[in-house]
Amino acid sequence: MPNPLPREIVPGIFWLGKCLEVSYQGNPLHAYNSVYLVAGEECSMLVEGGHPQDLAAIEAQLDALLARGVPELRYLFTTHTEVPHSAGLGRMLERYPGTTAYGVLLDLHLVFPQHSDRLRPFDFGDSIDLGGTRFVAVESVIRDMPYTRWGYDTQRRVLFPGDGFAYSHYHADGHCGAFAEEAFSLDLPDMTALFAELALYWTRFVDIDPYVRRLDALLDELEVQLIAPTHGLPIGDLEATLPAIRHGLRLGSLRKAGQGF
């Protein structure tokens, strides 16, 4: 099956990347380490640095979009410096010399010393003007690193939650490149619980309900219209899909070690 990405999920925001095959109970599953190109009227930002195995595909997709007339790529943003989210930053900085990287970048000046002058901090409430919209660093409610920052596009009201809203999908059922609402056969609670156990292990040792309540409050405060996660399918109908996500987070927090997997 050809790669269905890139896909324009709302006007001016493009979903880039390709699937990663994983195994679950002996069956093949697919997951994403997604990257998003956020275009304003004057310039664009790349959200997430990309996983190493995806970089060739991401670069080809990005070059094609820029050649089509998407405003110049000027900014890079990573939610946190874990490999699937930031490993490609050095390569992107090299390939696009007019860009600057933003985030809580910790020791990346040691990883990419040749680009240390192009690494910038990006704390909660900081924003970047892309022309006609701003990209804002917001609270990261569900995360695997304490310094994670989520991103938010103010004009299109799109939330970029990194490891939040993470779940796998079924390749054989045609879910690749789909919105969550288009993946009719997907067991979203189970796939959310699976990802929580593997990537958000701490959720099994806490009462998850305060986090769920804070997540709901943040979505209301920002008036989020679409969610673009790094490791899940985009969510276009929050009212229809979020109950399954909440159920999956609660299910994952109740599971004992190894149960169900």
Predicted regions and their residues:
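Conserved beta-strand hairpin/beta-sheet module of binuclear metal-dependent hydrolase folds
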Residues: 4-63, 150-153, 157-161
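Metallo-beta-lactamase
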Residues: 8, 94-229, 233-237, ...
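Short beta->alpha connector loops
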Residues: 20-21, 81-84, 140-144, 209-210
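Active-site neighborhood of phospho(di)ester-bond hydrolases with catalytic His/Asp-centered motifs
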Residues: 47-49, 72-81, 101-105, 159-163, ...
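Short, glycine/acidic-enriched loop or turn micro-motifs at the edges of active sites
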Residues: 51-52, 83, 166, 234
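Active-site metal-binding motif and surrounding structural segment of the metallo-beta-lactamase
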Residues: 54-101
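Binuclear metal-ion centers of metallo-dependent hydrolases, dominated by the metallo-beta-lactamase
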Residues: 225-261
